């Protein structure tokens, strides 16, 4: 389904944003990223090649390139580092910083 990008949002030409995703004011989606059925609040950022499905990113939250989120809620100003895979309804507190490859949950279970 269609996606909605609000004022000053940036979505790379080769990003796949669909499934009713809302990209908030000033939020961004990098090249090659996939965002489906998700909400990116104002100023949130999804890095190149990241995958975000059925998730919520709080204001100013950052998902680093190549990270994957499936059914996750990420608090305001949180940072999800490269190589993290979050799934199964995981919640990340506002301001939390997950260093690269520190969390890996399979979304296949």
Which positions does each model-derived feature cover?
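Left-handed beta-helix
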Residues: 1-109
């Amino acid at each position: 389904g269609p996606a909605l990008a609000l004022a000053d949002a940036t979505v790379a030409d080769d990003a796949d944003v669909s499934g009713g995703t809302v990209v908030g004011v000033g939020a961004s989606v990098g090249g090659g990223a996939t965002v489906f059925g998700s909400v990116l609040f104002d100023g949130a950022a999804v890095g190149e090649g990241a995958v975000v499905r059925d998730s919520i990113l709080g204001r100013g939250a950052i998902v680093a390139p190549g990270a994957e989120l499936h059914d996750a809620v990420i608090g305001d100003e949180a940072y999800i580092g490269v190589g993290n895979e979050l799934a199964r309804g995981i919640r990340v507190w506002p301001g939390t910083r997950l260093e690269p490859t520190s969390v890996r949950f399979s979304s296949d279970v």
